Amino acid sequence: GQWDELYYFLVIEELQRRQMYQSELDEELERAYHVLAEKFVSSDYTRFGKMLLDGFHNVRPGGRYVDFEVPDLEGNKVRLSDIIKGKIAVIDLWASWCMPCRAKAKAMIPIYEKYKDRGFEIVGVAREFKNTDRLKQAIKLDGYPWLQLVELDDGCRIWTQYMLGNAGGGVFLVDRDGKILAVNPKPGEVQKILEQK
């Protein structure tokens, strides 16, 4: 009844809070979600809760990256897996207003230039709000030579899927099979892995 639905809302709120603050997931909370998901199969809570749980379980070293489709700067839809399949890749989730994100990305430019012809790819995905004006300025100023995609107004909930909450961004190094090798690796770590592969 309505109490179950209210309880479901509270379970989802708690999952989201833990994701936002990058807290641990406990079995009891996950069990409560699964019981309620069976009861409310077609609920938006069920879909959102699954997205949150997938992030908890997958987005870590040894897990698999979460695929998505978002537009590039010209508005063409691009599926991430189409770009990085069979390559060692960095998925750079960033924002024009996140200066630490931009500094990390700029530090990757020499590595990208050195290894881009050897099966290495970087894909930037910028979390922007309202428009892409500041994003275009940042790309021009910082000189990123790789593909940039746009997550506008959290339309695809990529930050939620990647367990980033309200953070400006995150960097994910994945292998040729889509397995996450490192989260927020330093440029030296990326280069070391590329030299070994």
Residue ranges: model-predicted function:
Residues 79-102, 108:
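Short active-site neighborhood of thiol/selenol oxidoreductases, capturing the structured segment around
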Residues 103-142, 154-160:
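Structural microenvironment flanking redox-active thiols in thiol-disulfide oxidoreductases
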Residues 1-78:
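Oxidative protein folding and maturation machinery
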Residues 78-79, 181:
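Generic structural signal for well-ordered beta-strand positions
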Residues 90-91, 122, 171:
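Hydrophobic beta-strand anchors of alpha/beta hydrolase catalytic cores
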Residues 142-144, 151-196:
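Thiol/disulfide oxidoreductase modules built on the thioredoxin-like
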Residues 122, 148-149:
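Conserved beta-strand scaffold positions in the cores of enzyme catalytic domains, especially
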Residues 64, 87, 166-168:
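Short, small/polar residue-rich loop motifs at catalytic or cofactor-binding pockets
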